[in-house]
Amino acid sequence: MSVIFINDYHLLLVPEMLREKIPDAPIGLFLHATFPSSEIFRCLTTRKEVLQGFLGANLVGFQTYSYARHFIGACTRVLGCESTQTGVNVNGHIVSVGTFPIGIDANRVDQFRKEPAVAPKMKAIRDMYVVARIREILDRLS
């Protein structure tokens, strides 16, 4: 079975909808936006529906630990779910919650850069830009 992965706030209700249609589907949801504290989240009139949408996923991801913590806190305070630092218990089903910061692993990129197979590709790119740089210098001199 394919993994279904949903990205961002426009689609927060989709995991629950999918869960109703495909109960065994592995569903992930990643929120690129901030998740507010439960005190602020409680101000939403549709707070329960939004949280239930999230909880249709098997895995919910956030960019920072504080956003994940806010989400878990909202599930506990608004829906009364039991939770831990890594997940929320929804009627005996655990929804995992994780932190997945977006960024580049500079050490890993540097490691790949040093591999022998990469050297010719790096040279080709450098050579391509040297010609462009020479043209730029000549254009400025004209």
Where are these regions (language model features)?
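Catalytic cores of carbohydrate-active enzymes across secretory and cytosolic contexts
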Residues: M1-S142
